Amino acid sequence: MSTTFNPQVDLSWSGSARSVRRLGDNWEPLRRLYFLDFPLLLLSVGLLTWVFPTDTMLVVSSSVGAFVGFYTLWEVVVRRRPIRFAHFFCIANTAGYGFGVLNSWLTISRGDRGLAEFFNRDAEAVSRAMAAVLISSGILYALGEIYESPIFGSNFKLNFDNRAVAFIFFGTVLIIVGYLTGTMGYMGTSQDSGGHVTVLAGLLAWLFPALFAFTCLTYLAWPKNALKSAIGFALIVQFILLVPTGRRGILYFIVMALIASRFSSFRPTWSFFKKIIYAFILVIVIFVGALTFYYLRVAGWGKHKVSLVDRISLAIDLFESGNTSKANEGFEKNLQKRTFILGYLSDLLDASLRMPTAMGKNALHEFQLVIPSAFWEDKEAFLYQEESVANTQFNFAYKDEANSLYTAGAIDFGLWGMVLYPILVCALFRLLAEFLRVNLPEMVSTIAILALLYNSLVTEAGLWVHLLAVRNAILFSAFLWICFKMPALALKHPPQKGAFLR
């Protein structure tokens, strides 16, 4: 395709020379697959599903969404194609909702019942919710490919030095301190008695995904020596510390590590057989980590406020007893049912078609949630969740559901909110990433942007979670800047260009 016509928005501050653009400047031309083919496919299947909302069309639309989402992810991870926030949000929603439905449909024994009926949902409402996901994603795919310039140029490679290693070790120690002080534990970071998240808890929750990806990247780029082994050990420690935070976190962290590996000079030349072996090992690692987390969950059943140390002890006792059939069966059933996260969204969208919507009240409340407590003395009075807004607006009785950008949009503006909210948050992320790119050193801006990319890849992240990621990126980038402000020490064996230069 000719590159003479390229309407992408160039988000560069005035005065920045194109030849020295931070994070690379070699961009691929527009790809028809993403500004035309995929959008048309998603829009056409979505419209058909909306007009014919049956259980069969639910499976068809979910399959199409899962295929498009995973293909986009494969292109980013394996083929190292351009990274855009728009496409990451599309991956999160098409693969998250689509594969979730497809997995439950394939694995649950339902007899003659449809999937929606099995989950006590209306088939038409569930089908139309999946249709809305495809329609919204189709629009975002096209807008992202046309108007959002890639964050990283295809020629971008990070320059590593002693400061990168110091940051890895310091960050790993910080995570350990978080566990020792109770700031982190089972299911991630904890809150104080007033429901507030401490500064350390907020820092660790924001930093951990990017730290893990950056550690993997540094390990691949570092030459073979004792320090490389130390980096590898830190990576193993981080993975062990990751397991108690949740199964989805394990998957997302590893995906982000694979994406970050593109920023080094490391290029695997493995045979096809070796690639299969390594992929199989990776799947085993994810499975073992997820199963370990589930054992930690089972160990706490029937008990009140079980500490992480007690959970680990009880989980070990459970495993050594050999009486794990109930836990394994529960793990299997959980994998079958937990992925069906479309039900809550379908209820909200269906209600929004019949009843007045919140008209932005939910968005305003979720914005209030991310205001630091230091600036709002009685903030705890407003610490209710999205479900409370939905319950008040639509007369539901939800307690804890799968929040997302789509559910926030459906509460406020119905279908139009599902289309609009991802676009607005994507634009906000891209503007912030550009600000970080221009004003911070490459190493610091890359880590901060990796944290934003991680957030955009998570399906079950409500509007306030995305706004929190923006707030934390602004606040905690100063912490990263300080970490990398220390002087760089000369390396004993100067590396080749593209591995470490500073």
Where are these regions (language model features)?
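Membrane-interface helix caps and helix-loop-helix hairpins in membrane proteins
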Residues: 52-54, 241-248, 459-467
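Membrane-embedded catalytic interface detector for glycan/lipid assembly enzymes
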Residues: 15, 57-58, 113-119, 141-302
